[in-house]
């Protein structure tokens, strides 16, 4: 039996994740069969998705109201304070829950894309601290990282795959139009690690195909 590499698994499951998201509400009927228990509703009034971490009472209600993102945690022992973010100029694509640092407590990640032709991706994420409270997760900007930003012009896709965060985007060569990138796809895999002032997503592997 052929052994599947972490890159192949990430690419495969990301494709499944994005295809599932594109199907909209039809896929939500089977959400309880997935590892992440979710309830999602997208309407003209905004985005609403409830995520519960399997085997625990910890959950997050992710919603929008106007240009505000609202994250309401529940099941934490110390603080379940509501979290607010101004998302003017962005649209929420999806939200996921998972345990990226394998500490038995979840992270909640919300994926956004900028309005306009570039569709630059953005992550708003939180990590649970020993079941007591949450702190924000930091994802360095692709545009600020010279090791991976060559040919980057947005159109990001993001997903949690097991305990890895994956981000991929088309690579543009000089002269490419926005609608026709010719440089293939760059996929970045991150691990969640403890930083000096909080948890950060650190690049673990970069693959182009």
What would you call each of these model-derived segments?
Residues 4-8, 17-58, 147-209:
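Acidic, small-residue rich beta-repeat scaffolds with periodic aromatic anchors
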Residues 64-66, 117-120, 180-185:
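Short, solvent-exposed loop/turn segments at conserved positions within beta-propeller repeat blades
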Residues 70-79, 120-140, 192-194:
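Beta-propeller blade repeat segments, especially FG-GAP/WD-type strand-to-loop junctions
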Residues 85-94, 145-152:
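Repeat-based blade/solenoid architectures
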Residues 102-112, 163-166:
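Acidic/hydrophobic-patterned starts of short beta strands in beta-sheet-rich repeat architectures
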């Amino acid at each position: 039996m052929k052994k599947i590499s972490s890159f192949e698994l990430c690419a495969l499951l990301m494709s499944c994740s994005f295809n599932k998201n594109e199907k909209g509400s039809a896929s939500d009927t089977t959400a309880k069969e997935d590892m992440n228990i979710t309830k999602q509703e997208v309407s003209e009034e905004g985005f609403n998705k409830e995520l519960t971490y399997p085997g625990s009472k910890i959950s997050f209600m992710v919603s929008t109201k106007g240009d505000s993102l609202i994250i309401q945690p529940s099941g934490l022992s110390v603080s379940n304070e509501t979290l607010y973010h101004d998302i003017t100029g962005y649209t929420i694509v999806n939200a996921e829950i998972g345990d990226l640092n394998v500490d038995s407590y979840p992270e909640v990640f919300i994926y956004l894309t900028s309005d306009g032709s570039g569709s630059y991706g953005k992550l708003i994420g939180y990590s649970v601290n020993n079941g007591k409270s949450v702190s924000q997760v930091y994802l360095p900007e692709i545009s600020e990282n010279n090791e991976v930003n060559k040919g980057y012009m947005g159109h990001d896709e993001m997903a949690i795959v097991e305990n890895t965060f994956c981000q991929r985007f088309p690579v543009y060569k000089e002269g490419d139009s926005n609608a026709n990138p010719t440089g293939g796809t760059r996929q970045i895999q991150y691990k969640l690690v403890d930083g000096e002032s909080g948890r950060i997503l650190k690049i673990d592997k970069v693959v182009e195909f």
